[in-house]
Amino acid sequence: MSTGKVVQVIGPVIDVEFPLDEELPTINNALKIKKADGTVLVSEVTLELGDGVVRTIAMDGTDGLQRGLDVEDTGDSIKVPVGKETLGRVFNVLGDTIDGGKELGPDIKRDPIHRDPPDYDELNPSTEVLETGIKVIDLLAPYIRGGKIGLFGGAGVGKTVLIQELIHNIAQEHNGISVFTGVGERTREGNDLYFEMKGSGVLERTAMVYGQMNEPPGARMRVALTGLTIAEHFRDVEGQDVLLFIDNIFRFTQAGSEVSALLGRIPSAVGYQPTLATEMGQLQERITSTKKGSVTSIQAVYVPADDYTDPAPATTFAHLDATTNLERALTQQGIYPAVDPLASTSTALDPQIVGEEHYEVATEVQHVLQRYKELQDIISILGMDELSDEEKTVVARARRIQLFLSQDFSVAAQFTGLPGHYVKIEDTISGFKGILDGKYDDLPEEAFRLVGSIDDVVEKAKKISATED
């Protein structure tokens, strides 16, 4: 392999000169720079400047670097560990373990993080719904196997618990694998998530990859590809259905913007990199279903200043199949998960995909909730007495629907003391159909809160009436 020398260091940007009689490293190749203290820094080739000089982006801090240090071309892009050995472990962008556990041996299989998306003839074009066991998602904003879902929510509205429950349900009911990728978020949150997942028993079916906000932009830009590479191995080699969580996809774009500016590229709209759509496409196109398995991605999306026309979220939206919106007002009413049933959307909510009955029940539920929303102003000003009998019925059923959209989570059982519920799609549909038809109008509203199927509602109603007697 070629060896060169460091000729310039500007922050995370390192220029390396190779002898003209040696082969230049290609774009995306990983270079190893041996520091004076014996440690090795990895950087990635991003530009060829000519005269044997390449410009690289460091994957770690450049403290202690100096001109003249030896640089070795690895001959390939960054390679990270893949396979069952990655489950239950935490990695950085380079695939090094950072959880303080046993180091992975040299024999473990490693894959390059830069790869092409699956060929057209390998894709599985079927639009199969992925059952999550969470009523509000399965009914109103169903996930497609191999699809991409955007998860919107502020701090403290239950994003982490929802992510944990999805990981738990995929592991328990589908025997699936999850890969969690923390991109440019707080180290404290990553640490909390690790210990919460350890406590709730889902860590052994999960691989975690972190490139948090204290990392250089190169690491934050590439860590999503590291997580995706681990997920692709489970899909293509193990034939698994994989859940890939990316928190936060905006930070991936943000890191790309920083790198672009450091490389001297002319910025595009709002200061973003001119290659924004290309970089996003290269990541998103690898997230798909093949004939061997699937990678279903759930991506937390930060929207700068709540501006949905900002190029970063707007570019992300073009790739999403479904959105799950978490609403703070619902947590204040004690409705968990706090998924907004009217704001959450899915391309899978189509009679040709989910079936006529599912589609009709879902649209009728949305219609009733929308009507209730419109009547709330009248109720708050004039009271229930001013409503017609038909409107009173709509309000009563809407409240039952709203409460029935909540349910207990298995991963929260250690805090609530209540067992979690996994609800099959057919049970979800029949339950809401019964509420819409008025079969359960005589049951108390409180019986619908934080339960699983409609049978649990009936049981809870019996207990409530028994205590009242």
Curated annotation (Swiss-Prot):
N-terminal signal peptide: none
SUPFAM superfamilies tied to this protein: C-terminal domain of alpha and beta subunits of F1 ATP synthase (SSF47917), N-terminal domain of alpha and beta subunits of F1 ATP synthase (SSF50615), P-loop containing nucleoside triphosphate hydrolases (SSF52540)
Record's GO cellular component terms: plasma membrane; proton-transporting ATP synthase complex
InterPro entries linked to this entry: AAA+_ATPase (IPR003593), ATP-synt_VA_C (IPR055190), ATP_synth_F1_bsu (IPR005722), ATPase_a/bsu_AS (IPR020003), ATPase_alpha/beta_chains (IPR050053), ATPase_F1/V1/A1_a/bsu_N (IPR004100), ATPase_F1/V1/A1_a/bsu_N_sf (IPR036121), ATPase_F1/V1/A1_a/bsu_nucl-bd (IPR000194)
Subcellular location: Cell membrane
Gene3D superfamilies listed in its UniProt record: 2.40.10.170, Bovine Mitochondrial F1-atpase, Atp Synthase Beta Chain, Chain D, domain 3 (1.10.1140.10), P-loop containing nucleotide triphosphate hydrolases (3.40.50.300)
Enzyme class, broadest EC rank: translocase
Molecular function as annotated in GO: ATP binding; ATP hydrolysis activity; proton-transporting ATP synthase activity, rotational mechanism
Binding site for ATP: G153, G154, A155, G156, V157, G158, K159, T160
Keyword set, alphabetical order: ATP synthesis, ATP-binding, Cell membrane, CF(1), Hydrogen ion transport, Ion transport, Membrane, Nucleotide-binding, Translocase, Transport
Coiled coil feature spans: none
Reaction it catalyzes: ATP + H2O + 4 H(+)(in) = ADP + phosphate + 5 H(+)(out)
Superkingdom to which the source organism belongs: Bacteria
Enzyme Commission code: 7.1.2.2
Subunit structure and binding partners: F-type ATPases have 2 components, CF(1) - the catalytic core - and CF(0) - the membrane proton channel. CF(1) has five subunits: alpha(3), beta(3), gamma(1), delta(1), epsilon(1). CF(0) has three main subunits: a(1), b(2) and c(9-12). The alpha and beta chains form an alternating ring which encloses part of the gamma chain. CF(1) is attached to CF(0) by a central stalk formed by the gamma and epsilon chains, while a peripheral stalk is formed by the delta and b chains.
Family, similarity comment: Belongs to the ATPase alpha/beta chains family.
Biological role: Produces ATP from ADP in the presence of a proton gradient across the membrane. The catalytic sites are hosted primarily by the beta subunits.
Entry-linked PANTHER family: ATP SYNTHASE (PTHR15184), ATP SYNTHASE SUBUNIT BETA, MITOCHONDRIAL (PTHR15184:SF71)
Name of this chain's protein: ATP synthase subunit beta
Organism: Pediococcus pentosaceus (strain ATCC 25745 / CCUG 21536 / LMG 10740 / 183-1w)
Primary gene name: atpD
